[in-house]
Amino acid sequence: MSGRGRPRVVGTAGHIDHGKTALVHALTGIRTDRLPEERRRGISIDLGFAPLDLGPDAPPASVVDVPGHEGFVRNMVAGATGIDAVLFTVAADEGFMPQSREHLIVLEALGVRNGVVAVTKADLVSPEWSRLVVETVSEELADSGLASAEIVVVSATLGTGLERLRQALTAVLAALPVRPLDFPFRMPVDRSFQVAGAGTVVTGTVWSGTVSEGETVCVLPAGLEARVRSLEVHGRPVDRAEAGTRAAVALAGPGAGGARRGVTLVGVDRPWSASRRVDARLWLSGSAPRPLESGDRVRVHHGTSEVMARLRWYGDGAVAPGETGEALLLLERPLVPAVGDRLVIRAYSPVTTIGGGSVLARRPPRTRGSRRSDRGRLLERLADTSGQERVTAVLGAAGARGVEEPGLSLDTGIGAAQLAAISLEEDVEAHGGRWFERAVREDAMRRIAESVAHHHETHPLETGQPLSIARKAVRDADSALVEAAIHALIEDGALERRGAGLAVVGRELDLDPEDARLLERLERRYREAGLEAPETDDVAGDLAVDGSHLRGLLRYLEREGRLVKLASDWYADAGAVGRARDLLVARLARDGAADTGACKEALGVSRKYLIPVLEYLDRSGVTRREGNRRILAGGDS
C-alpha cells in the first residue's frame, strides 16, 4: 500500500458523448475505449479502467470509465458499483441531458455522494455560455447527493481546467473514510478473459478485505473453489490486493471456468453465502412513472449482477414515487449481499432506472400474518439504526441461537474492529464464537435455575438435575449460550455441579422416615437376591410402592454405590456384581476366554441373570465379547 493512504476508486458518469472517455485519457494518458466497436463508433459500450495518479499528495486511485448510452446503463451500473467518488461530466455544448439524470439516480441509489462535476468541451462554447451551463448544472444537482460538489470547467482537447480538476479530485479523495480491511474479502467480477500462460483472469474492484497470491477463493453463487495464481493492480504484479483497489486475478481450479461478470469472489473461510431472498429498504425516484406495487417484477442491480426479482412490501401494498418502504425481494438468481449494500432498481419494462435501496437482511426468514408485521417493524428499526443499536437489533431477533462471529459483520455491515469495541459494552457478549444479547443469556440463566429447582421438588431423592435435562430448559438455544449460562450460575453461587448434574447450592437430601424405611428394605431385598435380582415392577408390587417413586429410590441407591444398574430397568446388589466380576476376571485370566456356558458355571446363575451381568461388564470395560466368548478387555483372543 502507498504511504499516501488507502487506494480509492473514481467512476465516471454522464450522458453519452459528454467527454467522459476523453477526460479520462487527458487525466491518465490511457485510452479506456478498448473495444474496436467503441473506437469505430466513438462511444463507450463497456467498462474501461485506468490508474489515476493525481500527484504526490493524493491517495493512489483508479478510474472506472462507464458508458453513457441509454442502451448500456446496465454496464454503467456494474462499473459505478463499488466506487468511492464520481467524476460527473456534463458537456458545455449540450447541458444536462436524459442520461445525465438517469446516471444521477443511479449514483443516488448507490449512495455515492462525493465527487467532482466537470463541465467538458469548454473549447466548443464561449466562456459566457460555460458559465450559464455551470448555473444550470448547479440547479439540476441541488436536491442530489452532489449538491455541494465542486463544478470545474475543462477542455480535454486544450487541457484547460485539468489542473484544477486534479486538485478538486485530490481534495475529495483525501477526505473520504477508508474502507475497512477487517471486513471479509469480497470482489464482484466485472470482466473475465483468457490470457495465454495465465488462464482465466477476472477483474473487479475489491469491495472489502484483502486477497493474496496463492490463496484459495470461492466463486459464488456456484460455490466452486479456485486458487489465486497471480495478482496485478494496473499491470503491476502484487502479492496482495486490498479494499479499494482495482485488481486482476488469475485463477486456477474448478471455479475458474465459471468466473465471469456477475459472480463474486470471496474467501473460503469466511461466512459469505448466496441468497435468493433479501430484505431491503427501497426508495422510488420522484421521476418514476407510477407507484411500485407488491407483486411487481423489477430488475435488481447489485455489485456487477443484474437479476429479476418479485417485490413484496412489508407495509402498504404500494409505494408512490418519492417515497420509501421496507420490502422482501424474491430473486430469480442468487446474490451475495451484506447488510448495507446498495441496490439499483430498474423497471421491468420499459427498462429505466426508477430507484434504489440498501440491504437490511441477507437471509430473511419466511413470515406470514402477524409475524410478517413484526418483521416489517424490525426492518424499520434496522433501517434507522447503525453501530451498536443495529447489532442489538440483529442479536435480539436471533434470540438464543445467536449469530456466528464472522457472520455478524455481514448481518450488520460492521467490521471486526468496531464489533470488538461494541463487545465491551454491557448489552452484548460473545460465547463460543457466537454473539448474543446479554439479556438472552440472563433469561437462559433464569430458565435453567427454575428447571433445576423444579427438579428438586419433583425428584426429592435425586441430588440434582441431569445436565442433559437442564440444558433443554432453554429451547432452540445454541450450546455455547447454555454452557455460558450454566457457568454464570455456578460463578454466582446459585447452582453447583453434583456428579453429572446440577443442584441448587445448599440443597441437601432430606429423606422422610417412610422413604428411609423403604430404602432399608430395598437394600436388604437386593442384597439377599444377589445376582438373581427381582424385576423392578415385581418389587413395586411386593412393597406396594408407586413405580415412579420406586425408581427414584433405586436411582438413589445407585448413586450411593449400593446398587448397580444392569439394564434399563434392572438393578442388582453392588456387592454381588463386584464378586461376580472378580470371579470372572480370575477365570478369564486363567483360561484366556470363556463361552456363555463356562461363564454360567463360574457365576452359578441361570442365563436369565447371567446375560445382563456379562453385558454390564462389557460396557464397563472389564470384558469384551467375541462371538459367544468373553475375554478380558485389552486381552488377545
Predicted segments with their positions:
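Conserved nucleotide-binding/hydrolysis micro-motifs of P-loop NTPases
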Residues: H69-E70, A92-M97, V112, K121-S126, ...
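Residue-level signature of catalytic and energy-coupling elements of molecular machines
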Residues: D17, L23, G42, D65, ...
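Conserved Switch II/interswitch segment of TRAFAC-class P-loop GTPases
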Residues: P59-P60, V66-G71, A80-L132, V539
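Conserved catalytic-core segments of large NTP-driven translation/proteostasis enzymes
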Residues: S2, A122, E139-A288
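C-terminal effector modules of nucleic-acid-centric enzymes and ribosome-associated factors
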Residues: T12, V125-S130, T136-E139, P254-K565, ...
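Conserved G1/Walker A P-loop phosphate-binding module
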Residues: M1-V66
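G-domain G4 guanine-recognition motif of GTPases
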Residues: A91-A92, V116-L132, V152-T160, L165, ...
